[in-house]
A protein has these predicted regions:
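N-terminal leader/targeting and accessory segments in enzymes
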Residues: 1-61
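ATP-dependent carboxylate-amine ligase catalytic core
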Residues: 20-32, 57-142, 152-153
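Nucleotide phosphate-binding/pyrophosphate-handling subdomain across enzymes
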Residues: 34, 134-146, 151-248
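Residues that mark the start of a beta-strand
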Residues: 35-37, 59-61, 196, 223, ...
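Hydrophobic alpha-helical packing residues
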Residues: 51-57, 118, 270, 316
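Glycine-rich phosphate-binding loop signature in dinucleotide/nucleotide-binding domains
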Residues: 118-124, 218-222, 290-299
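C-terminal helical cap/extension that packs against the catalytic core
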Residues: 196-197, 239-299
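Glycine/aspartate-rich loop-and-adjacent alpha/beta segment that forms the canonical ThDP
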Residues: 306-321
Length: 321
């Protein structure tokens, strides 16, 4: 019997692009016919969390799969807002890996694992994004489902309209309460003010564009300091999108990330477009440098790999106590 660590390690080794045309035949259709699909957008996980919160506040059991989790893959598979346990992750993962480990990409396996888990937990609703590296429709029957367009706004009205398509009676006060409780970690999350410390999961060209747009919208006249730790496969486009926007850029080597670009190399890339570059030896040093350079109205935005971002968040949250 495989344990959590073994399943996780084997899952991480699955290569994108290894999917076979008959993958779909290997998977039983999930029989939950209350599925809410959210097509690809920067805000798809935030929309999903808001929908989950409203349904949960109305006493429904909700399974949600996310494209993004700060801590580990357990955070991508949520049942009633709680991550799947290591025991269940190992149990469901082993069933999929043992006979079919060459037939799934990593994201396919995680999604199928989530759907099997939600089915056994008797979820009333599934909330699924469709930018997971494979189409959610491969593994779930789209009998009674609806989708959020990426052009629609992320707001209470959007989520409630979407849910009303399921003929669910919503209570206004309950919706308000759910929205007040809803908070999405690591997506333009303000951790501290004066100066402003922001954590964001931007780690590629598209998400970095969104981050820059949000900074310009909310803080158009504030100086920016960026703390950046990136993977090797996405840093070039990220550098082009954000280098000129910052007054100062601090690079780091993300911890526990074998595919990360070393901070010193990332600094060299940034320096081609912006001379105000510093490479820090740790997240703590990066935050200390930013704090020294910042004025009260400075916006310090950290973005990049998930492990680095979670360490940054925990450091800032700890100093707030």
């Amino acid at each position: 019997m495989m344990n959590y660590t073994q399943v996780l390690e084997q899952t991480e080794q699955l290569k994108i692009g290894k999917k076979l045309p008959d993958t779909m035949k290997l998977c039983e259709k999930n029989d939950c016919n209350k599925i809410i699909y959210i097509p690809e957008s920067y805000e798809c996980d935030a929309i999903g969390e808001l929908i989950e919160a409203i349904l949960k506040e109305h006493k429904y059991n909700v399974g949600r799969f996310t494209t993004y989790a700060l801590k580990n893959p357990l955070g991508q598979i949520l049942y009633n807002k709680k991550p799947i346990s290591q025991k269940d992750f190992a149990k469901y993962g082993e069933k999929l890996l043992t006979p079919n480990d060459t037939l799934f990409t990593k994201e396919e396996l995680l999604l199928k694992l989530a759907l099997d888990y939600f089915k056994d937990e008797n979820a009333d609703f599934l909330v699924l994004p469709c930018d997971t590296g494979c189409e959610a429709e491969l593994f779930a029957e789209k009998l009674d489902s609806c989708a959020v367009s990426e052009k629609e706004k992320v707001c209470k009205e959007l989520a409630t309209t979407l849910i009303l398509q399921k003929n669910i009676v919503l209570q206004e006060k309950t919706v308000e309460r759910a929205c007040q409780k809803c908070k999405y970690e690591g997506r333009f999350e303000i951790l501290k003010k004066k100066p402003f410390y922001i954590a964001d999961g931007a780690d590629d060209e598209k998400s970095t564009k969104h981050l820059m747009a949000k900074l310009q919208y909310h803080y158009p006249n504030n100086p920016y300091i960026f703390i950046v730790g990136m993977a090797k496969d996405s840093y070039e486009t990220v550098v082009k999108e954000c280098a000129l926007a910052a007054q100062q850029i601090i690079t780091i080597t993300p911890p526990e990330a074998p595919n990360a670009i070393p901070g010193i190399e990332l600094a060299q890339e940034f320096s081609k477009l912006n001379p105000n570059i510093t490479n820090a030896s740790s997240i703590e040093e990066a935050v200390e440098i930013a704090s020294i350079l910042a004025e009260k109205d400075t916006v310090i935005a950290a973005f990049g790999t998930t492990v680095f971002l979670e360490r940054y968040r925990q450091l800032l949250l700890k100093t707030n106590k």
